[in-house]
């Protein structure tokens, strides 16, 4: 299934250059308060796997969309996926750093992170991949 961005029919993720996002989870223990879609993992490898799955597949988006009052009104562009996305995680003292490489636009990445981590994450830097 090809992924299209809202307002840009025919533009799939493979047509957009990949970006490297440097992310930080300062207090992984506080993520349980992020809600129904929060990270289940507490460690860097597990969080990296969950975020990678959220970028590669639309399962998290579909669960969130189904929970909305009017699922049909949700912009389908928010469900964009990048099958080539990669995420790696590292523990540094008490915080977890994640590096995501994806073609998904930053606004969609931020939406997925808000679902997984609420306000408990920080975007530290961005660079071309």
Residues of each region from the PLM?
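Non-membrane alpha-helical segments in proteins
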Residues: 94-95
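Long, contiguous binding/interaction regions
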Residues: 2-5, 9-91, 101-129
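Basic nucleic-acid-binding interfaces
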Residues: 98
């Amino acid at each position: 299934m090809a992924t299209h961005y809202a307002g840009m029919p025919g533009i799939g993720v493979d047509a957009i250059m990949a970006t490297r996002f440097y992310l930080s989870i300062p207090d992984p223990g506080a993520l349980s308060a992020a809600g129904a879609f929060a990270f289940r993992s507490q460690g860097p490898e597990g969080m990296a796997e969950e975020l990678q799955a959220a970028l590669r597949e639309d399962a998290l988006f579909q669960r969130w969309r189904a929970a909305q009052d009017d699922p049909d009104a949700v912009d389908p562009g928010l469900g964009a996926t990048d099958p080539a996305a990669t995420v790696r995680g590292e523990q540094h003292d008490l915080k977890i750093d994640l590096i995501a490489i994806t073609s998904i636009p930053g606004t969609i990445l931020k939406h997925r992170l808000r679902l997984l981590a609420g306000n408990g994450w920080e975007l530290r830097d961005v660079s071309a991949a």
